[in-house]
Amino acid sequence: PVEADGPAAGWFGGFRITLEGAAWPHDYFLNLDVPYAVGDPDAPAMIRISPDERKQAPACPPRRAVATAPPADAADRSAGQGSGTLAGTGALAEAPRAMLDVLAWNTLYDARRRLVVSPVSRDWCADWRGPIVFCWDTFFAGLMAAAESPALARHNFETALASVDTLGFVPNYVMAHGAASLDRSMPPLGAWAIWKTQAATPDCAWLAEIYPRLRRWHAFWFARRDGNGDGLLSWGSDPEPIYEFPDLLPYNPTLRHSAKAACWEAGLDNSPMYDDVPFNPDTHTLELDDVGLSSYYAMDCEALASIAETLGQPREAAAFRRERETIGRRINERLWDETAGIYCNRHWDGRFSRRWSPTSFFPLAAGIAPPERAERLVADHLLNPEEFWGEFVIPSISRRDPAFGDNDYWRGRIWGPFNLLVAEGLRRYRCDAAAAVLARKSLDLFLRNWRSDGGVYENYNAQTGVGGDVWNADRFYHWGGLLALVAIQELIDVEPDGRLRIGSAEFPDAAIRGFSLGGSRWDIELDDGVRAWRDGRPVLQCSTRAVIRLPLATAADRAVQIGTSRSGRLTIHEAPCACDRAVLPGGAMLTGTTSPTGVTFTWSV
């Protein structure tokens, strides 16, 4: 029985919450108004939301009320968004708050381990008897949190990396009582996610603390996952015991040192890509060179090089850049199928896999694809409605694949991480029009479900756009919010080549207010033109719709890049770096005119 004052059940955030029997221990706080307590502080949490209660849950007026915001006025900007609240207008009127609602609902304080973290879902925490930390999920949570709360982003990053000191890698998961997946890791996206939140204004003291952990995790991959020694990576699972508490989950030998466990390391549990791939018990890996994992590794190299350079470690930075060049060359030599015009996984016997997923586009996010290959890849495959395009995108396996119709988890359904990483690659290769359409489609899918039933789903049906049509799509799962983040990043984002991108040429009219970046709050407005403010001070004004890329300190080229097909005028009042040159699509160079109010570029098309 509940011993603290307060209800044993009630409506919260659109859900009916029932605390059955023992409630959460008194030293865990779940962001409820009253911390619940039990007689035994070691008793597990028992939070249950029944399927019937989910269906009966009413609309939540408080959540809808905070989901929209009025247009920013001069007073808002001069205040510098001191409240720290992320909000939007126009096409982004609801998405920012909805994204942060699901993240906040799933953010917990674990007093035993003295940590704040945003697990994937409170339901999962109940099933796993306390806050469970999954690897790449938590880094994505940090990316979303950083848009409003850099402190919460750091908490998530630090929690995800905490096990490296003991294990030498970030495990697939760590449970509240200490049990962890000792046999496997998960996609190495930590350095990439962290650097995206740090590149604008790096906190060197904090980066110096976590850099050794990122570096050690990086070393894990070629030490343990180059099974055939060809310089490319394969997912795997080591012959280690993984459960310290067998009474919590029944022992099952397939949970380690198996193809199933290797798929869990990929984070793509039942993906058709791995259906018929043998698991090699001697190398502890799948017998498949994986384009996704190898691309993640290249992204990790690039981010670690930037962090090392920032920390005054030029030799280490150079070493990471050489690693990136090497694995990029191997991916292009071994994993590009010239006949099909796509990057593929490759069996160890030399055959290309014909089970294509969005991981085929990850060489774009890594920046290692030659431009002509990137153009062919996007035109022939990504934008092909018979494969990956359509009303609802991006399916987790090609629409041509026989498993697409399964509509089961990674067998055809849409997942936020895939959309986010593909958008990253499109923008990197200046496929700005396609990126804007992907952002709009991601936003439409997200809002379709949010407006319908208040759900932010773990995954979505790629044919109907519905999230709640299957049992294994958690209704309030934090990374469903990545679909909203794709749209937010269409207006403002940090790119891996050291640029701050602002604006869009194709996205619907929208504005974002209070976006946290580099210790400042940013406001971006997009209508007939583009305008940006930082802490209430004007940064730039463009008379026409455009994608504007401002160089950061790490950019190799300090010219402003202006992506537009229209004539216009851009005035930069305040920029991260001094810039008096600009370049248009096609390479035409502009020289700015300096005045007391800034630098102005004018062009005709």
Task: Describe the role of every protein-language-model region.
Residues V38-A43, L167, P171-L189, W195-A199, ...:
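The feature captures the catalytic groove of carbohydrate-active enzymes
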Residues A43-A45, P51-A57, R63-P131, H155, ...:
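Low-complexity, Ser/Thr/Pro/Gly-enriched N-terminal "stalk/linker" regions
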Residues S181, M186-A200, W336-H381, P385, ...:
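C-terminal capping/lid segments that line or modulate ligand- or cofactor-binding pockets
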Residues A98, V102, T159, R213-G227, ...:
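Alpha-helical scaffold segments in carbohydrate-active enzymes
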